[in-house]
Every structure is written in C-alpha cells, then in structure tokens.
Amino acid sequence: MLPYPFSYFSSIWGFRKPLSKRFELNWFQLLFTSIFLISLSMVPIAIQNSSQETYPLETFIDNVYEPLTDKVVQDLSEHATIVDGTLTYTGTASQAPSVVIGPSQIKELPKDLQLHFDTNELVISKESKELTRISYRAIQTEGFKSKDSLTQAISKDWYQQNRVYISLFLVLGASFLFGLNFFIVSLGASLLLYITKKSRLFSFRTFKECYHFILNCLGLPTLITLILGLFGQNMTTLITVQNILFVLYLVTIFYKTHFRDPNYHK
C-alpha cells in the first residue's frame, strides 16, 4: 500500500477505487485531506488577487461614487489639476455637502457620505467617521475628463495603497465560502450515505467509511476546478463547477458499483 498522501491520490481515479479504498486513512488524515482540498481550491483565488491591479471601492463603501455628479466632474475637469501628487483648485464652487474640493476650514466630519478632494489626498467620510484616505497617484488630471475614468483611478489608488489588507480580506472571505461549501457537501453527502446503513442496500457501515468515500469522490473535481481557476474563472463559477462535477462523478460511481463491494451480501 502506498504511503499517505500518495495513497489518497491513487484512490481518486476511476469509478471503483473511490469505493474500494475507503478504509485506508485515519481521522487525522481525513481532516488533513479536507483542509488540503479546500486549500487547492483557494490557489486560483490567491493568484488572481496577487495579479490584479485594482478592486472596486464601491464593494466596501455603498454608493461611494454617487456624489460625483456630472456637474462635480465638470468642475474638477475645468478647475482642478494634480501635479506630483498635489491638487490645485482654481474654481469657486468648491464647498458642497457631499463633495469638497480643495482645503476646507470645517474640521467636523458630516453625517452623510462626503468626498473631500484635499490638497494631497482624497478623504472619504460617512456618519462623522473617516473611512479612508487616498493619495493622488493613479488619480491624475486626465482622470477628471469623465466620471468613469475618475472612479477607476480612485479605486486603483485605494486598492494599491491598501493592497495587503484587501487581499487578505478577500482570501479569507473566499476561504470561508469554499470551506463552508466543502463541508456542507461532504458532511451532507456522508450523512445521507450513513443513513442508508440500516437498509443494507450499500456496503457502507460507518460514518468514517462514508466520509472517506466522499473525500475520494471530491479529489478529481477539485483538481479540475483548480485547473479552471488558473484560467481566470471567478469563485462562483469554480464552486458551481466543483459541485456539478462531484454529483456527476458520484452518480457515475453509483451506476458502476451500486455502492457495493464485489463480495457484498445483504
């Protein structure tokens, strides 16, 4: 018999090995294998996060760009310039409840959402609390030509200046979703198989056998999902594909084996 973890990988191929090799691992190895499969699913997400240059700020702050009306963008385009990370404003209509352009004498933060284009940074506040400060790097004078170009520049600067924290948050969030889906599918399917024990329709006798078998069935779908993820598929697609492939593989194994060992007798 192959040593672990090679014994596990040898049991995920074909339509009979996942069933026949459901006795080889102990509980510690099963738990480690579960974590390993979840980690494999996370590899594409981590790679995607490390390679992306921007992330939409509105994902974290609702309606953050709503104050940037056409009038505000036009005012910025006509009267604001950014040189070496410093904003210069020559207009007069710089003070408004939701948008402030240039230095402000008012120190108290408003309750409503406010975007303050200060001299060296954009300050976003809401409910009298400062949410974030964004230095002018991707935000350049050319970005004031349209709302789309301005919002893209703001999101890019915000992401680049907070990249470590945002990436960590996204990876942890994705890990939670992948883990939750994995354990719902694996434990749910194992429990359903274990319930059939009394009917003597199948060869399963313990919950450990059922869970081991389900992990064997999840191995190949997880590897395929990993490959798809490396081609840029998003998390929702990966979870959906993994679940569909798992069900199809499980159904095919049932068709081939009826979940019974060759020497099984009721």
Swiss-Prot record:
<protein>
    <recommendedName>
        <fullName>Maltodextrose utilization protein MalA</fullName>
    </recommendedName>
</protein>
<dbReference type="InterPro" id="IPR016546">
    <property type="entry name" value="Maltodextrose_util_MalA"/>
</dbReference>
<comment type="function">
    <text>Has a role in maltotetraose utilization.</text>
</comment>
